[in-house]
Design a protein with these regions (language model features):
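Flexible, small-/acidic-enriched active-site or ligand-binding loops
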Residues: 61, 79-80, 106-140, 144-146
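Short beta-strand-to-turn element immediately C-terminal to the catalytic PLP-Schiff-base lysine
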Residues: 23-26, 65, 91-94, 103-106, ...
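Alpha-helical interface subdomain recognition
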Residues: 1-3, 25-28, 37, 41, ...
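Active-site beta-strand/loop segments that form the cofactor-binding cradle
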Residues: 1-13, 47-51, 70, 76-78, ...
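A short core secondary-structure module
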Residues: 76-113
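A gly/ser-rich beta-alpha-beta helix-loop segment of oxidoreductase catalytic cores
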Residues: 43-66
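A generic structural signal for well-ordered coil/turn residues at beta-strand boundaries
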Residues: 18, 42, 56-60, 84-87, ...
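Internal helix-loop-helix
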Residues: 1-41, 82-88
Length: 284
């Protein structure tokens, strides 16, 4: 939440989701090899979104072909955050008509296979990764493929970021409403500006309740209840964050449309979060 509130550009979320992928799907030998590296400071990321941007993680086009004791990869992944600096990534592929997760080291990926994407939020270092021609040892194939655990972990991190972002943008709005004067009155005294600010606060509290409920259920290993709460949090929070970002830009007037105003940064982050792992219509 604090990272979202301050619009922190960090590989933290991707690394945490990669940890969840290892914990839920890797063998004990793989865990003992990869998890200590993360503890020591290694950056990891996830490559689970196909080139068509599908929100269904089971719809996988990337393929793997076994050649001796190695696996040849084909296809591409998009929206891979921090791919250029991650020491390894967890990617989803289809192998013998089964969904598999594989570990790919950074030194196994050619530099020209990592392409920076132009996205609405440039604080997000998003890349497309071309898998064609990449070969990895079969020992880097995870024995399980718990996509549901990965999705829940990713949505929890994303919803926490949305919750923090709502706090940050609301503070930005309130500060400006209590600073800017028009016709010798603070603009925050006008009803047309006060009411949307209150609406944002109410949406924030509702979304945060869903988020904390989901986190509690995950901690208690109640995945079905956690999924319901997370979908409610994502649907409610993504819509609220986009609305709050838009109001922040509008309330700041012409200044809000410039790069010098932080309001546009919140709007960009809101639009990025809104379409990660499904928008509000998808989850409802």
């Amino acid at each position: 939440e604090s990272m979202g509130r301050n619009l922190m550009a960090s590989p933290y979320a991707g690394t945490i989701v990669a940890i969840e992928a290892l914990v839920s799907s890797a063998s004990e030998q793989q865990k003992s090899e990869w998890l200590p590296k993360i503890v020591e400071g290694a950056i990891a990321t996830m490559a689970i979104t196909e080139s068509d941007g599908s929100w269904d993680l089971s719809q996988i086009e990337a393929m793997g072909t076994v050649i001796g004791d190695r696996l040849s990869l084909h296809g591409s992944k998009c929206f891979v955050t921090d791919a250029d600096c991650a020491e390894f990534m967890v990617a989803s592929i289809r192998l013998d008509d089964e969904v598999k997760l594989v570990m790919i080291r950074r030194d196994e990926i050619p530099d020209n296979a990592i392409i920076r994407e132009i996205v609405i939020d440039q604080t997000r270092r998003s890349f497309q990764v071309q898998l064609d021609g990449i070969e990895i040892p079969l020992s880097q194939v995870l024995p399980k493929s718990d996509l549901k655990a990965i999705e829940l972990a990713a949505m929890l991190m994303l919803c926490a970021e949305i919750s923090g972002g709502l706090v940050g943008v609301l503070h930005s709005i309130v500060e400006y409403l209590n600073t800017r004067k028009a016709f010798d009155r603070y603009i925050g005294s006008y009803q047309s500006l006060k009411h949307p600010a209150v609406d944002i606060l109410l949406r924030l509290e509702a979304m945060r309740s869903h988020l904390y409920h989901a986190a509690t259920n995950l901690a208690n290993n109640d995945a079905p209840a956690a999924e319901i709460a997370l979908r409610m949090a994502k649907a409610h929070g993504a819509e609220a964050f986009a609305f709050a970002g838009d109001r922040a830009v509008q309330f700041h007037g012409g200044f809000g449309f410039t790069f010098e105003c932080d309001a546009q940064l919140y709007l960009r982050r809101a639009l990025w979060c809104q379409y990660q792992f499904g928008d509000e219509k998808y989850h409802r």
